[in-house]
């Protein structure tokens, strides 16, 4: 009798364990672990880069976690064709001044943001987590590439990621709004910098907030999909000297454009 009770208890425990595994949500790749949300990347992540055997064409081979870089149908960046106009809601920017805290994480230069800044698109609020830079641009518009691209990375309380992309052209005049960043740019020998000065991310946006919208992915491993992209239509300008300051550290950190696979890209009205 005792043996029967023990056996029954064991079977019950096994059944409970199996049921728990069934009802628990399947483990998915958490965007919280992505370097978009952490200045220091996991020591366990597979090494990746932008050239050679660890470059973009090989990312899917570097780790099973990166397989969507090849198999995914909503990868970013893309070449944006500007023919689809749709009455999209305006992006409302609610950015607050924050201390300059910048880091070079081995792949990009990133400004870490404090809580308090956000955007709203329709009824959805996205909190600003950080912004970082690519040189040259990752997105192209009607085949045109730009000198640089800035990504302002946001996330809702529920985990939905939205990135506002700002294209950057080379122009003759310096952009004074960027001087507070350029004064403290990190580099390979000094990967983290801080300043008593503050940066208001609103100041580095174009005045016109019309945008392109599409569904895509992170542009770096693990290239997780499900990212809302808002690419501002009007570029901002930096002088050659200002762009060169960034390129001392991050020249060539752009993923090539990816197939659209039939995705619609909508353009908001001016």
Task: Enumerate the predicted regions with their spans.
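N-terminal signal peptide c-region/cleavage motif recognized by signal peptidases
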Residues: 15-17
